């Protein structure tokens, strides 16, 4: 009876530790994913932005997947799963878009600085 109780307790502790380890690995993997984005801006103010559909067509024709295409301020921002996808998209768009556009790679910030910037109202001033 005592041996069976101790074996059950060890099994329960082992399974709990394994479950905790799996949860930590899953959390770490989720935090490690880093998005990348590409911003397309016209060089001159009187140049219009490229159409999102034509951008989609060029990327799709070359097998490049993306998360979203959204206009943001004076740019068209394309979000990707990885920096490799955005680098490949930059090469494709450099070839296919007419001159007059700046295509810039942008690595998205890490999660911790994003949360910190959301939590604080204004930057702290020392001195």
UniProtKB/Swiss-Prot annotation:
Compartments, record wording: Cell inner membrane
Main localization, broad class: membrane
GO cellular component: plasma membrane
Protein topology in the membrane: Single-pass membrane protein
A single GO molecular function term of this UniProt record: protein kinase binding
Pfam families per record: SecD-TM1
Side of membrane Periplasmic, spans: 32-127
Transmembrane regions: 11-31
Ranges of the Cytoplasmic topological domain: 1-10
Keywords, alphabetical: Cell inner membrane, Cell membrane, Membrane, Transmembrane, Transmembrane helix
Domain of life (superkingdom): Bacteria
InterPro entries xrefs: Modulator_MzrA, SecD-TM
Task performed by this protein: Modulates the activity of the EnvZ/OmpR two-component regulatory system, probably by directly modulating EnvZ enzymatic activity and increasing stability of phosphorylated OmpR.
Family label: Belongs to the MzrA family.
Subunit: Interacts with EnvZ.
Protein name: Modulator protein MzrA
